[in-house]
Amino acid sequence: MTDEKGDDEAPRTPSLEERTTKSGRLPGNRYVRIHHSSGFRRRGGLYVAEEEALRPANAAGRVYDVIRRILFGPPLSTEAEEGERLSVPTGLAILGSDNISSSAYATEEAMRVLALAGIGAFVFTTPIAVAVVGVLAIVVLSQSQVIRAYPNGGGSYIVTSDNLGTLPGLVAAAALLIDYVLTVAVSTAAGVQAISSFYPELHAYVVQVGLVFIALLMIGNLRGVREAGIMFAGPTYVYIASLAALLLYGFFRLATGDVPPAALPPLPFGTEGEVTLAGPVGALLILRAFASGSVGLTGSEAIANGVPSMEKPEPRNATITLVIMGITFATIFLGLTFLAQTIGTIPDRSEVETLNSLVTRSLVGISPFYYLVQGSTAILLALAANTGFTGFPRLASVLANDRFMPRQFAYRGERLAFSFGIVALAVVSGLVLAARRGSVTELIPFYTIGVFLAFTLSQSGLVRRWRRLRVHGWQWRAGVNALGAVVTGVVLVVVLVAKFKEGAWLILVAVPLIVALLLAIHRHYRQMQDALVIERLDDEVAEPKPPIVIVPVGRLDRAAARAIAFARSISPAVKAVHVATSEESANEFRERWERWKGKVPLDIIESPYRSLVPPLLRYIDDIDKRDARPITVVLASFVPHSWWEWLLHSQTALRLKASLLFRPNTIVVDVPYHFDHGHVPEQPR
């Protein structure tokens, strides 16, 4: 390009760079100056969009952008992803909070079942807790093998699909998706219940408060992984420290013979039970109590699923975090269980006050330390739902990349978070929380089944992997995973049998339905891929035939004139069509049309029923039947200056565009005309 631009210059290919040839100071000295577009920079042969390119141009967009940045923070480039990794402390807070926080309610859920046989059955509480911790030890050992075998992320879906096939992998994925939703719902409900323990008036608003917690978690996660870790690390460690102090104080009092009297709940269970512990009924009751207490095992898979989010070396840091998580949970869970049984604490039948609150109140009374323990417990339980917000979007993105979920789930937002998955999880878990009225006891029967099903499948898959690869020490590794598969499989059966009538059967129905949905999505994407794929890149593209262009014209004005001019630029076969509601208006429009110099052939449709869009659609259908060429509908769209002015117009073009959206063999082109108050051009006469 030179300084002199002639009218006969050949059309240039548009570019973000403008090159001008300049004359130097010396004769014959010429150079090229390159003018770069703002908002983009060159890197190699690519244009890289800078943050400036994301800023909206209009005032309303700028206001929205400011609000969004206040809520979610400024956008992060892909290069900043490395800085979003989790250290061991923040990884324990984000990925381990679900498992650690379940120590606050696992004992109570087991005791609620034992209470059906009377408070004398509470002697089985500690043995059940020991059994749960034993299973957890096996699960932690098995999950460490998952981290070792899949250092790039060993979610149950990936492990199972890789070793057992697609269908078992989808079963594991469906189970985990359900488990993540329930993690958010159960943790939030438990957190609100912990608050209502020292503020009973809140019990009537558990659903509303829970929904607020979920919304705050959603916003926190939309801000990105690192900021979520900073937000959530504090409550996790305050909870651990306060519970450690409480346990030490409780053990000291017991060791010195100073056993405190048990605090009374608002509505205690009776001393006499409804069933007996003798015979098969008693054995089934103990199994049900173990099934309820095994809720403490949930969340132990989150670290193995989130290995890629850890700092390097990822496998080592993930393993350390996993072991610390298991030790922390076991210590708090066994300690609270022993104190509750020794002191003689009875759960609250009304679910107003938690067992954690009763034990704390028995030891320290209503003191500042009591509020510290309950406050940190409440916050951690609510924030433990963050495990779901970490796992669900990541799993959904993997499924989306494998074309088993909508592709929107694979896209990262401006803060490097899987925004679509985060919002979807918040909505679904909020609905589940509201449907069960925020009750932890009503939600527990649906819980744990998904995670144990995924555990069993992934551990079975690893056994097959070690047998196939036969690496050094494969027998020991296969033995560990085989033990994990057997133990988690037995727990799964126990939970299903014990909780079947209470709602576990719904999970057995939901998992196949979700798998069927995932397969249907995959089938659609596969069919679409087969239809769109270009098999040979060296084939020439066929020259398209000019289409039939139909221009609906409501009134003869500048917007219509611009649409017709565009239509004539893409095809010689242009037909305007006008729908009139009476013969008089039809004749008036035809008279104006014949006086207009830019006219094209016109058809007028009289619609005595005053309907505009259906006659146009039938007209387009009839034209399509008579001609094999594709049809292009060019719509004149009037765009007002302000948003409120948009409400003053009928938006017929928008309704017609929506009606034509799924019509085959039809191209819809929108030609917008922006109205400017400062310049009112002359209209066609």
Q: Which residues fall in each region the model found?
A:
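C-terminal membrane-solvent junction of multi-pass transporters and transport-like membrane proteins
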Residues: 266, 408-419, 455-492, 497-500, ...
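Loop-to-transmembrane helix boundary motifs in multi-pass membrane proteins
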Residues: 166, 204-211, 309-331, 400-434, ...
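Membrane-interface loop-to-helix entry segments
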Residues: 217, 222-256, 321-325, 444-456, ...
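Cytosolic C-terminal regulatory domains/tails of membrane transporters and channels
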Residues: 1-81, 527-685
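Helix-loop-helix junctions that connect adjacent transmembrane segments
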Residues: 237, 244-296, 498, 502, ...
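Extracellular loop-to-transmembrane helix junctions
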Residues: 111-161, 167-170, 186-214, 326-330, ...
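Hydrophobic alpha-helical segments and their helix-loop junctions in multi-pass secondary transporters
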Residues: 240-270, 337-344, 456-471, 520-529
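Extracellular/periplasmic helix-exit of transmembrane alpha-helices
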Residues: 251-261, 322-357
